[in-house]
């Protein structure tokens, strides 16, 4: 699970941009697939996805190809212990963020918010255009 401090930062960063963030820790492939489906029904604007051990899942690949919203692939790995990433070309992946441990989620959110046109972000990191 994400450290509480990171969760607070995610919520604050989204709030500063006038957005809300829904956090969901998925314990299985099916939970991840269900969360993506529900997000689509809720008209999610964008998602941060950490595929974890599901990077090779054919079911996840199919769902990502058909997502009605873009996503940022995010990993909480470190530079010296990189996790495997999803294959290229799965839906509308606007970026992959990895190597910054839990801070990767904050960087991913900053990228997502910039993609949505939220350029007045109050965070410490600017991901640039």
Q: What positions do the PLM features span?
A:
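Short, acidic/small-residue loops that bind anionic groups at enzyme active sites
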Residues: 66-82
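Short helix-loop-beta junction
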Residues: 9-20
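Short Gly/Thr/Asp-enriched flexible loops that form oxyanion-binding sites at enzyme active sites
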Residues: 35-38, 49-69
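Short, glycine-/small-residue-rich phosphate/pyrophosphate-handling segment
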Residues: 5, 12, 80-129
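Short, structured coil segments at secondary-structure junctions
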Residues: 17, 67, 89-92
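Short beta->alpha junction loops
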Residues: 20-31
């Amino acid at each position: 699970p994400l450290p509480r401090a990171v969760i607070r930062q995610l919520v604050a960063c989204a709030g500063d941009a006038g957005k809300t963030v829904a956090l969901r820790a998925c314990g299985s492939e099916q939970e991840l697939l269900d969360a993506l489906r529900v997000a689509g029904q809720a008209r999610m604007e964008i998602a941060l996805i950490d595929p974890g051990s599901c990077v090779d899942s054919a079911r996840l690949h199919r769902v990502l190809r058909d997502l009605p919203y873009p996503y940022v692939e995010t990993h909480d790995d470190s530079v010296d212990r990189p996790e495997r990433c999803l294959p290229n070309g799965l839906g509308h992946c606007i970026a992959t963020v990895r190597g910054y441990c839990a801070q990767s989620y904050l960087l991913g959110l900053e990228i997502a918010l910039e993609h949505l046109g939220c350029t007045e972000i109050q965070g410490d990191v600017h991901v640039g255009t």
